[in-house]
Structure formats: structure tokens, C-alpha cells
Design a protein with these regions (language model features):
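Hydrophobic/aromatic-rich structural module bridging two neighboring secondary-structure elements via a short loop
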Residues: 1-20
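Ferredoxin-type iron-sulfur electron-transfer modules in oxidoreductases and energy-metabolism complexes
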Residues: 16-191
């Protein structure tokens, strides 16, 4: 049904190509490990210190839940970063004689210096606004203020236009900027 609708709107046919911002593995399959690395950089999770039953979690308002829910729908598809002019392709090839560990370290360093992208910024905001995740907000903000952080975003807003889940990515990026401003002032005056 979806293909029929796409072909109906494009009677001349459609062309399928792999994403251009990620290394191609084969055919239409791309290596999205860079996206997962950005999630690691911003610590897009809530650390747990055990698996035992700790009872009910912190209570929160319906309004707070409704703000965060759209951000939780991200499926890390990569459409937002594919459309982003600031998210440049980073393709590192293994040098001859280079061990797998050396190659991986060099690749991770290149990923860590490049723009995070809207998906990672949005996920950082999701967890910073979570009652339990808030305790690690400063670590996430530190990552967002580092190389390739929020300051690289040129506000082209292509990300929000192409997101298949209609996630308010530009709103998340703006919130990240506001949180970073407060964080930087706190760091400046807490010395």
C-alpha cells in the first residue's frame, strides 16, 4: 500500500540509494555505528545500580510525560542526520598493518570530534528531563558542549522536516541550548 502511494505520487518512478552520510556496507545497508557512538557520548540512558525491586519510581505530572513521550519515539533511523548539512560523512578506512583495536580507536576519535546530530541531542534532552535521569544531566551537558556539540547546529531545520516520527527535534536542540547556557553559568560561578 505504501509503495503504491509513493509510485502514485511519483509516476516517473523512484530511486533507492543508501544514505550518503554513513559508510556503505553493501547495497542499501550502511554502517550506522557513528549514531550509536553519539548516543554513548551523550550517555543516552539512565544508569541502574541493581536489578532488585526498588518500588515505585518518582511520580511526575502528565504534562511532563507528554513533553518527553515524542522524544522517546526515536528509532535511530538516521533520517535527521542524513538531511542535516552540518552532519558530514566521516568514513575512516583501516590502514595496512593497523590492528583492529587501533582502527577502532581512531574511528571513535573521529566520531567524537564530529557533530552529534539531532537524534543524540534529542535523546540527551529526553534523559535530562526524566526525574531519574536528571542526576546525570551535567555529564550529558558536558558532552553537548564539547567538540561537535550543540554549537555546531546551524538551525537548518531539515531534521524536523524529514523525521518519520515527527519528533520535535528543533525544540530539543533549543532546549539543549538553554540548558547549556545555565550549565555554563553554573560552572563559571561555582569555581
Amino acid at each position: 500500500a505504501l509503495v503504491d502511494r509513493v509510485l502514485e505520487n511519483n509516476p516517473g518512478g523512484i530511486e533507492l540509494r543508501p544514505m550518503s552520510k554513513f559508510p556503505v556496507l553493501r547495497d542499501l545497508v550502511v554502517d550506522r555505528s557513528r549514531m550509536y557512538r553519539t548516543l554513548e557520548r551523550v550517555k543516552a540512558w539512565i544508569p541502574v545500580d541493581g536489578y532488585g525491586d526498588r518500588g515505585a519510581g518518582p511520580r511526575e505530572s502528565q504534562a511532563s510525560q507528554e513533553v518527553r513521550y515524542p522524544l522517546s519515539e526515536c528509532m535511530t533511523c538516521g533520517c535527521c542526520v542524513e538531511a542535516c548539512p552540518q552532519f558530514a560523512k566521516v568514513e575512516i578506512l583501516q590502514r595496512s598493518g593497523e590492528t583492529d583495536a587501533e582502527f577502532t580507536a581512531r574511528q571513535q576519535q573521529a566520531y567524537d570530534e564530529s557533530f552529534l546530530g539531532a537524534a543524540a541531542i534529542s535523546q540527551a534532552m529526553l534523559f535530562n528531563d526524566h526525574p531519574t535521569g536528571h542526576m546525570n544531566a551535567d555529564e550529558r551537558l558536558e558532552a553537548l558542549s564539547g567538540p561537535g556539540g550543540v554549537q555546531v547546529c546551524g538551525n537548518a531545520q531539515n531534521c524536523v522536516a524529514v523525521c518519520p516520527k515527527s519528533i520535535p527535534l528543533t525544540t530539543s536542540i533549543a532546549r539543549a541550548g538553554r540548558q547549556l547556557t545555565g550549565y555554563m553559568f553554573r560552572r563559571l560561578f561555582d569555581r
